[in-house]
């Protein structure tokens, strides 16, 4: 059953077990939903700016007129209309802004599925869960603390889970976790006024695990020495963990905050791109290279 937008809009969480083409079709529907709300948010934002500007210009023009009393009634009506228009536009913009999703998340998943489809059976299902709610949602806050003068709220957002199986029988599981910090501090300016400043920090942590088919590959314990040698991660990412746990190969990497989910660029090693799909592709390639080396040695 395809995605139900009415249900999706309640939580902004998409969860389904289906074939890759079916999941991809759902993601395109979600993308259309997001594009509509982005357009509406922009439209009502322009309405806010227009009503504010017209009201301000009218007030200044009438206030500097020598015939202020003559235009008082008209001015009050006009300014009241602009005020009401501003409030309506603000409410509408806020409503659509709440449904303005993080494009890069579903774009990353869509691009990764496109890459995985090449080595998956056409009828092989994948299990997907993607959370498109904002990373600083109250339900994702784990603790509060202090860093120097900053009051910090810490959030953990496990927004992506994807699992499936390749044609060779290897099972995979991909997880995406956003670590988000909301920082705020209060200070006094030179004039003695109390002011506040806020900023945020975030990083994406991606974890990939592979469970090889024991009939085709050597025991996982034999792969430990090969994993670090086979790593080919983008230069802008950081390896956090690589190793073997029981019967699985594990690799965890971190990305900068400004990563995107668009297709892999012509020059993926350019630090200005920070392509999430490129990082995931290189993680798969690194682990599979270790598997293939193990298979060749076994043969």
Question: What kind of feature is each model-predicted range?
Answer:
Residues 35, 121-125, 295-296:
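Residue-level signal for secondary-structure boundary elements
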Residues 1-112:
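N-terminal alpha-helical membrane-insertion module
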Residues 2-12, 288-299:
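Terminal low-complexity, intrinsically disordered regions
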Residues 124, 128-293:
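Structured extramembrane domains adjacent to transmembrane segments
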Residues 96-136:
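Cytosolic juxtamembrane segments of membrane proteins
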């Amino acid at each position: 059953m395809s995605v139900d937008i009415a249900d999706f809009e309640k939580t902004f969480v998409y969860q389904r077990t289906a074939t890759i083409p079916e999941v991809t079709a759902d993601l395109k529907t979600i993308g259309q939903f997001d594009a509509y709300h982005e357009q509406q948010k922009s439209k009502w934002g322009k309405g806010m700016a227009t009503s504010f500007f017209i009201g301000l210009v009218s007030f200044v023009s009438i206030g500097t007129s020598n015939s202020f009393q003559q235009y008082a009634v008209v001015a009050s009506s006009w300014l009241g209309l602009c005020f009401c228009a501003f409030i309506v536009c603000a409410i509408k913009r806020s409503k659509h802004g709440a449904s303005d999703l993080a494009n890069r998340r579903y774009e990353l998943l869509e691009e990764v599925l496109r890459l995985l489809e090449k080595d998956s059976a056409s009828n092989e299902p994948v299990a997907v869960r993607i959370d498109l709610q904002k990373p600083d949602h109250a339900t994702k806050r784990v603790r509060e603390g202090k860093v120097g003068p900053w009051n910090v709220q810490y959030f953990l957002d496990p927004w992506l889970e994807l699992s499936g199986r390749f044609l060779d029988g290897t099972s995979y599981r991909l997880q995406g976790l956003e670590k988000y910090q909301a920082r705020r501090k209060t200070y006094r300016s030179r004039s003695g006024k109390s002011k506040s400043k806020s900023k945020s920090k975030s990083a994406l942590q991606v974890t990939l695990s592979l469970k090889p088919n024991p009939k085709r590959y050597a025991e996982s314990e034999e792969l430990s020495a090969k994993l670090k040698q086979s790593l080919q991660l983008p230069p802008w990412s950081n390896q956090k963990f690589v190793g073997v746990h029981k019967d699985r190969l594990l690799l965890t990497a971190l990305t900068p905050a400004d990563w995107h989910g668009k297709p892999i660029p012509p020059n993926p090693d350019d630090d200005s791109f920070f392509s999430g799909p490129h990082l995931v592709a290189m993680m798969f390639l690194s682990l599979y290279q270790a598997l293939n080396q193990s298979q060749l040695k076994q043969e």
